[in-house]
Amino acid sequence: MIRHIVFFTVKPENVEKVRAGLSILTEIPAATRLEIGANVKTDGFHRSIDLVVYGEFEDEAALAAYKAHPLYEESIRRVKPLRDERSAADYVVEDAVTTRV
């Protein structure tokens, strides 16, 4: 399984528009789980993430199918002009450290 996590920073006046643009992604069938969440900002750092996309995919082929879907491109078209920054990470769950090393 692959986890796909994307963080967005957004001006306050654009948060709901970006969330709506990201919500399009939930209609792509390639993900086994896909969530769009707003950061509750309990960390206390000055620069905080505003929105998060969290996805789970069976394998790299499923993630590639997700990124190749026309709705993925539509989401980018809507979100990119409104977001400030975007950071993403993908990792294989079976390779993740789950105990002290």
Model regions and ranges:
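Short S/T/G/P-rich N-terminal loop/turn motif that feeds into the first structured element of a domain
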Residues: 1-51, 58-68, 91-101
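Long, contiguous binding/interaction regions
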Residues: 68, 73-74
